[in-house]
Amino acid sequence: MSLRILHVLDHSWPVHSGYSIRSLHLIAAQYRLGFRPQALSGPLQFVDDPNATETVVENVTYRRTPFDGKFSEWAISRRRPILREAAVVRLIRNRIVELVENDPVDLIHAHSPALCGLGALQAARSKGIPFVYELRAFWEDAAVDQNKIGTRSFRYRLSQRLEDYVVHRADAVVGISQSILDELKRRKTDPAKLFHVPNGVDVEKFSPVSRDEALAAKLGLGREPVLGFIGSLYRWEGVAWLVRAVAELRRRGTSCKLLIVGDGEEMPAVREAVRDLNAGEFIQILGRVPHDEIERYYSVSDVLVYPRHSIRLTELVTPLKPLEAMALGKAILGSDVGGIRELIEPEKTGLLYRADNVDDFCMQAKRLLEQAGLRRELGARAREIVLREKDWKILARRYVNIYDSAIRNLGL
């Protein structure tokens, strides 16, 4: 298993996102398994941090893709449509060719979006190197929810066409959810080259801990049960909706508090909802906290809530954060969108409510908040599942067969 693997990423650590966390743990687990991985992130990360051209994280070298002239810098920094996308693809392709000529690799493993995939595919084919493409999400759907494009727009259709082009020409394709694989089959992708590697978690980092009483006192939590949301505040995560739902839950007589840990584009709407409802006494917005302290905030939350809205993206893509909560043995309450249903078995490893339905949310939340025994049972079973099926050490082994298949399929 000493294959030399070049991972091609949109962005990587120290950028903090679900995307970068999956990459970090996956690549580190591959290294410990005996692979020889290295990673390259695209030029969009270079825009944010032009001085960091190379770093080493957990024994793996991460490199950047710098601009190669004024035109590429202008096209990318000024966000010129089409020209920007073309510049990203060209820069990634040329950077990969440069790297593999100086330090040969056995396989190129690109991760969505399609711009990373297309640049990596072109480089792989020019050098006769097997190529694996991994889909984390269909990024055009995220752009729709962020009001950047419409589903009938040229850019939406172009993004889908580019994705299909890369997928159909890859030697092997990985999807992080079964729903993504089903969508690829619908788009006439050869099922024989499709593989499933779900999100995982570092079970050694995320293991059950006692309540951090010092933090609880600092936050003034008292003895009321605490709902927690820990994650990025994208619109599709539904956190502003959650604020209103928790206010209604309390109005109906269920005692609780809500902690919101994280930041993102929906923060203004979340703050506005708290102000409008005069909910500051029982809802605290803590913003982003240091990653190495995140377990402390999990420890003071009795129930972790994942209130995703039902849109195309959330029906297809599995979130990462619930797995952290499961590894910690926490009770989970989530909306019944497809991405969460793939992680949570109702009444066994958590509870689900009908997405965007306040009445159902209040009913299920009341059960969890008022029954400590139920919380313990669900949390214990959730951790058992994670230890058995979602440990990155276990999931990384799936790439042995995936890479073997890609090597066999090269040129077919």
Name the predicted role of every residue range.
Residues 306, 324-327, 331-334, 344:
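Short hydrophobic beta-strand element within catalytic cores of glycosyltransferases
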Residues 179, 200:
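Carbohydrate-associated surface elements
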Residues 360, 367, 374-389, 398-401, ...:
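A short, well-ordered alpha-helix in the C-terminal region of glycosyltransferases
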Residues 346-347, 351-358, 367-373:
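Conserved acidic donor-binding segment of nucleotide-sugar-dependent glycosyltransferases
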Residues 261, 268-295:
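Nucleotide-activated donor-binding/catalytic signature segment of Leloir-type glycosyltransferases, i.e.
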